[in-house]
């Protein structure tokens, strides 16, 4: 019936009928010019008579006569031949478009107008990821998207139609095939129809519930045009996901964040019927006795946690705090369980004899034994499991109980220590996903991969060069520290290799859309340098930052990478690495990775900012000063000094 109405609306139905049935593609039906001219003449009157009256000065009477004639003519015309006029009850809703920065490509503004004016989407938001903090995981340098557009559709059908039209538009106007996810047609294949008929004979399944995650409720379109990505969601799905908090600036988080609230009260007699139908009698009685709210937090529990912060307490004091905490741990929410873990974690760090790692691991898993948490639709258990894995890896790194069983000054003991960390993580993950069919989403949490890699090495001293130190020196005008030039970490090479193999397998087999970010690549680079493994350091530099990225990054990004490399080498203060850089990567390199001078010329012989130029000059001077007299007489090094001296 719907197809038939659509066909009629496109072929011959009048405008009012077409608008009622929702036909989008149609051709206006209008009367011929001759018919309109004939119908506009007064019937039964001499057309010259109004002119004669006008000559006598009766202008008002002429106007009244003309208006009456027009009304009579309009009433005599069939309704489907009258001129089109929109109903006064239908108001055109003007959608306010977001501000488009001046540096954004014109295609961004084109997409915004297309989504609003042509497709009728609402609540359009634009996020410029190039303006985020460089340390932000979603900065344009850390992932392949520069601009995110979020908008809301009226229904799943509306979103499907808009997504289909958007794909067609990009295909015909940009000669590109966009990548669209979440878009599904409502049409059923013959095999699906037969399967549904077999199900119908057996009766409906009580578990056939998508819980709001229906097809076309969230459609993502990677336009492949100027690194622009478009998300179209239903209003309820958009409120649930709250994607805006991922890509907004830090100062705008409060604007988009929505407070977690308890289940809304409703007078609807059908609310919760589907969920109630699938519950066991015990679960129904349990829910009637205690209502669950994910946002409730027992303030007294948090007060116990604050008492442990920054204090070194005796064993008796710790046990008194534990007794008071457990007495207030009544009808716990998901937040209370997390507070409980952080409370006992602080005790474990202070005194592992009072709270062992085994007990603390059980406390972290206790929340999954709570029936009200498992049955709650307001809690994303997949997200909770990912966060628990992150918290457990942090616990393994800081736990004093594991470290006291190994002599970390011995290389063999360090390897055994790293093996122990990975073994405990594997046991925890096995328990965490024991009764779940989910797979681990390694790309969901920005800290997951860095922490997984962090388990592969042990710090030898307190000063380890990382991305944050490099940022402080470049952008905060920090001073270059004087380090001894010795390795600051020990890396378990076998475990590091296994970790990289696991990440590559996940990106190739599990989630083909996942890719390592530039921040994680820089973490790998600095780890090899801090461990003194310079062969892998330079190999990672060529593959991750130059060789494979020559066709993907512009000259500005190349200069940024060179500046960060020079600052790192100056801080690391390893003479062999400095000599290798000056001989092989400074000018006219024979390596496929290129050289700094080549990329500097491609960038019109300028740095991206004064901060980069200042930090680059100071770092090169520090490297040259660390060389002995023989190396200073090297003509290639004198050319380096001359280049730096001539920088404005």
UniProtKB/Swiss-Prot annotation:
Which region of this protein is its transit peptide?
Answer: 1-29
Keyword set for this entry?
A: Membrane, Mitochondrion, Mitochondrion inner membrane, Transit peptide
Q: Where in the cell is it found?
A: Mitochondrion inner membrane
- One GO location term (cellular component): mitochondrial inner membrane
Superkingdom, according to UniProt?
Answer: Eukaryota
Membrane topology, record value: Peripheral membrane protein
The answer to keyword Cell inner membrane applying to this record is: no
Concerning its family, UniProt says:
Belongs to the ATP25 family.
PANTHER family this protein is in? ATPASE SYNTHESIS PROTEIN 25, MITOCHONDRIAL (PTHR28087:SF1)
UniProt protein name: ATPase synthesis protein 25, mitochondrial
Name the source organism. Debaryomyces hansenii (strain ATCC 36239 / CBS 767 / BCRC 21394 / JCM 1990 / NBRC 0083 / IGC 2968) (Yeast)
């Amino acid at each position: 019936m719907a197809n038939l109405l659509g066909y009629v609306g496109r072929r011959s139905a009048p405008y009012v009928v077409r608008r009622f049935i929702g036909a989008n593609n149609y051709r206006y039906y209008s009367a011929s010019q001759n018919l309109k001219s004939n119908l506009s003449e007064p019937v039964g009157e001499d057309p010259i008579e109004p002119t004669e009256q006008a000559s006598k000065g009766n202008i008002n009477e002429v106007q009244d006569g003309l208006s009456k004639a027009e009304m009579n003519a309009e009433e005599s015309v069939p309704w489907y031949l009258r001129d089109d006029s929109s109903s006064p009850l239908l108001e055109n809703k003007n959608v306010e478009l977001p501000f488009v920065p001046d540096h954004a490509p014109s295609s961004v503004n084109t997409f915004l107008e297309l989504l609003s004016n042509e497709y009728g989407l609402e609540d359009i938001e634009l996020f410029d990821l190039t303006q985020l903090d460089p340390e932000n995981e979603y900065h344009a340098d850390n992932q392949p998207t520069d601009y995110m557009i979020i908008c809301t559709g009226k229904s799943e059908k509306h979103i499907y139609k808009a997504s289909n039209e958007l794909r067609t538009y990009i295909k015909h106007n940009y000669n590109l095939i966009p990548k669209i996810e979440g878009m599904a047609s409502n049409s059923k294949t013959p095999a699906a129809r037969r399967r549904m008929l077999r199900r119908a004979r057996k009766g409906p399944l009580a578990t056939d519930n998508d819980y709001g995650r229906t097809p076309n409720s969230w459609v993502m379109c990677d336009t492949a045009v100027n690194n622009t990505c478009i998300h179209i969601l239903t209003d309820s799905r958009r409120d649930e996901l709250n994607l805006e908090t991922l890509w907004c600036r830090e100062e705008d988080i409060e604007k988009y964040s929505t407070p977690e609230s308890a289940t809304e009260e409703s007078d609807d007699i059908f609310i919760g019927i589907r969920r109630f139908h699938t519950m066991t009698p015990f679960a129904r009685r349990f829910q009637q006795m205690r209502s669950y709210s994910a946002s409730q937090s027992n303030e007294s529990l948090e007060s116990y946690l604050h008492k442990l912060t920054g204090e070194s307490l005796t064993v008796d004091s710790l046990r008194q705090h534990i007794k008071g905490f457990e007495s207030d741990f009544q009808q716990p929410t998901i937040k209370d369980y997390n507070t409980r873990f952080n409370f006992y974690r602080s005790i474990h760090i202070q005194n592992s004899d009072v709270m062992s790692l085994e007990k603390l691991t059980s406390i972290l898993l206790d929340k999954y034994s709570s029936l009200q948490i498992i049955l709650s639709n307001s809690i994303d258990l997949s997200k909770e499991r990912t966060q628990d894995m992150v918290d457990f890896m942090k616990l393994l790194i800081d736990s004093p109980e594991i470290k006291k069983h190994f002599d970390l000054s011995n290389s063999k003991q360090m390897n055994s220590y790293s093996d122990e960390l990975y073994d405990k993580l594997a046991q925890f993950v096995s328990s965490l996903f024991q009764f779940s069919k989910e797979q681990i989403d390694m790309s969901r949490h920005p800290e997951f991969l860095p922490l997984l890699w962090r388990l592969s090495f042990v710090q030898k001293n307190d000063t380890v060069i990382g991305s944050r130190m490099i940022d402080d020196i470049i952008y905060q005008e920090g001073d270059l520290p004087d380090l001894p030039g010795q390795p600051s970490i020990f890396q378990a090479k076998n475990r590091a290799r296994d970790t990289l193999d696991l990440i590559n397998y996940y990106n190739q087999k599990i989630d083909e859309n996942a890719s390592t970010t530039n921040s994680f690549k820089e973490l790998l680079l600095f780890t090899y340098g801090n461990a003194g493994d310079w062969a892998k350091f330079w190999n990672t530099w060529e593959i991750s930052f130059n060789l494979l990225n020559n066709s993907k990054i512009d000259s500005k990004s190349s200069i940024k990478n060179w500046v960060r490399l020079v600052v790192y080498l100056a801080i690391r203060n390893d003479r062999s690495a400095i000599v290798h850089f000056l001989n092989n990567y400074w000018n006219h390199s024979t390596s496929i990775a290129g050289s700094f001078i080549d990329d500097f010329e491609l960038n019109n012989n300028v740095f991206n900012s004064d901060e980069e130029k200042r930090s680059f000059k100071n770092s090169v001077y520090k490297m040259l000063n660390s060389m002995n007299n023989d190396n200073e007489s090297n003509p290639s090094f004198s050319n380096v000094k001359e280049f730096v001296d001539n920088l404005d």
